[in-house]
Amino acid sequence: MPINRIALGSHQEVYHPGALKAAFAEFISTLIFVFAGQGSGMAFSKLTGGGPTTPAGLIAAAVAHAFALFVAVSVGANISGGHVNPAVTFGAFVGGNITLFRGLLYWVAQLLGSTVACFLLRFSTGGQATGTFGLTGVSVWEALVLEIVMTFGLVYTVYATAVDPKKGSLGTIAPIAIGFIVGANILVGGAFDGASMNPAVSFGPALVSWEWGYQWVYWVGPLIGGGLAGVIYELLFISHTHEQLPSTDY
């Protein structure tokens, strides 16, 4: 069971060169993702005068985030695993695929990457505000369920295409599959709660603009969804027992 495989690791791991390189890769990947995702929304808003709230703006956001995440996961995959998301890291932790200390190091890197991306966007766009997440036409509990379900789908996709040792050649399309599910989920939930699925994505803009409304939804929902996906996939679909190969007569 995953609970038996959860590892705390050692605090010394935080200072290990390999862990630090992986964390820096997470920082860069998250910066790339948030800069492109948030920046596309800011550019669309400037061009259309509030356009991100329109159907065209929603489609543009979905496409931009899908492409940006595809790239961000790809460039980090061989170094850190390309999590780019605290919920993905948490899902990997509860599934026994990353230690607690390395996971916390990833979290710090991801939050810093998002924050730096938002500060860079504000500086390089003449002080234009970054987009923050909020609820439109749904209650806080409905938004929480949305975030749980959408993030479950995201982390389940990560497990199926990137974590599962049986993935084989499917692993080569993992980044694009992960980008696609995020883009599709933005089309589903973007009009209701912004479709974060990623605490880092909502944290950076909130910190830079100092607007913390409903921020807990964008932490609790993704962490529950990511954790459930990690536990379920590990329990049901990943075998950790040795299976003897059938004997063959020569």
From Swiss-Prot:
Keywords: Membrane, Repeat, Transmembrane, Transmembrane helix, Transport, Vacuole. The keyword DNA damage does not apply. The chain crosses the membrane at residues 24-44, 56-76, 104-126, 143-163, 172-192, 218-238. Gene3D superfamilies: Glycerol uptake facilitator protein (1.20.1080.10). GO terms for biological process: leaf development; unidimensional cell growth; vacuole organization; water transport. A motif (NPA 2) lies at residues 198-200. One of its GO terms (cellular component) is membrane. Expressed in roots, shoots, leaves, tassels, ears and embryos. Expressed in meristems and zones of cell enlargement: tips of primary and lateral roots, leaf primordia, and male and female inflorescence meristems. Highly expressed in the root epidermis and endodermis, parenchyma cells surrounding mature xylem vessels in the root and the stem, phloem companion cells and a ring of cells around the phloem strand in the stem and the leaf sheath, and the basal endosperm transfer cells in developing kernels. Belongs to the MIP/aquaporin (TC 1.A.8) family. TIP (TC 1.A.8.10) subfamily. This is Aquaporin TIP1-1. It comes from Zea mays. The lineage of its organism: Eukaryota, Viridiplantae, Streptophyta, Embryophyta, Tracheophyta. The gene is TIP1-1.
